[in-house]
């Protein structure tokens, strides 16, 4: 669908319909890729185990790496959408019902829910130093966004990534660091797995604060 972007040269906002690889310029699309990638690899590994086929070690390694990055990115995405993007849309009086279409719900809400319950049910052995994977994926996304802007599309999907403002590098570093911080928060919750349902209560409470399934009404719409 259409999305608002910021041109590289003029630093002005305009609307376009991305095609091809440009569809993956949004952070939420990376959330979807992480979710699909993780569960695809998990199904492959589980099927091989059931069929008594020798495990492929690098597949198990990638499953863990993608899980760590995916759950961190999905929680960050849901938080940003609910507390930054949607309030801005309402403040500007924009119609934002498209943010609640099925594919958008998968990227903004259900990815975080799927990853969260996977963590609660499977209880993987997570380590605090795994936060580096989230940081690396953040750097990878930022590199992709700049590569696409300078050598292909000529635009950024997020204004804070535009190099013109002097504080742009701070926002870019902050994005990558936020992924790592979200992972550390989730890892901390896993320390309560042995305390009955405490980890479940905390995660479900956290999810309830970051997911949103219905548009926010504004005076603009009521008028």
What are these regions (language model features)?
Residues 1-47, 62-68:
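Early transmembrane hairpin module of multi-pass membrane proteins
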Residues 2-16, 50-58, 89-97, 142, ...:
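Interhelical loop segments of eukaryotic multi-pass membrane proteins
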Residues 19-26, 58-63, 91-106, 128-133, ...:
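Non-cytosolic membrane-interface motifs at loop->transmembrane helix junctions
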Residues 25-26, 152-217:
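Membrane-interface transmembrane-helix boundary segments in multi-pass integral membrane proteins
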Residues 35-41, 45, 70-84, 110-117, ...:
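Membrane-embedded alpha-helical transmembrane segments of multi-pass integral membrane proteins
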Residues 53-73, 124-136:
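Interfacial segments of alpha-helical transmembrane regions
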Residues 100-112, 169-174:
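Membrane-interface loop-to-helix entry segments
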Residues 111-126, 148-151, 181-190:
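Alpha-helical transmembrane segments in multipass membrane proteins, preferentially the mid-helix core
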């Amino acid at each position: 669908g259409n999305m608002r972007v910021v041109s590289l040269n003029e630093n002005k906002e305009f609307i376009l319909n991305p095609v091809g690889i440009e569809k993956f310029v949004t952070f939420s699309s990376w959330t979807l890729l992480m979710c699909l990638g993780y569960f695809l690899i998990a199904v492959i590994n589980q099927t091989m185990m059931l069929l008594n086929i020798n495990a492929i070690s690098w597949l198990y390694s990638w499953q863990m790496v993608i899980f760590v990055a995916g759950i961190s990115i999905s929680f960050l995405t849901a938080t940003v959408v609910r507390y930054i993007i949607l309030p801005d849309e309402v403040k500007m009086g924009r119609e934002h019902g498209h943010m609640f279409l099925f594919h958008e719900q998968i990227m903004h809400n259900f990815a975080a829910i799927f990853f969260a319950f996977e963590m609660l049910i499977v209880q993987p052995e997570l380590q605090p130093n795994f936060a580096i994977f989230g940081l690396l994926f953040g750097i990878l996304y930022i590199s992709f966004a700049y590569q696409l802007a300078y050598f292909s599309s000529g635009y950024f999907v997020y204004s804070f990534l535009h190099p013109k403002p002097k504080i742009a590098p701070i926002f870019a570093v902050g994005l990558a660091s936020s992924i790592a911080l979200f992972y550390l928060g989730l890892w901390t919750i896993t320390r309560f797995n042995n305390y009955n349902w405490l980890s479940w209560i905390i995660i479900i409470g956290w999810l309830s604060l970051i997911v949103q399934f219905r548009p926010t009404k504004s005076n603009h719409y009521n008028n």
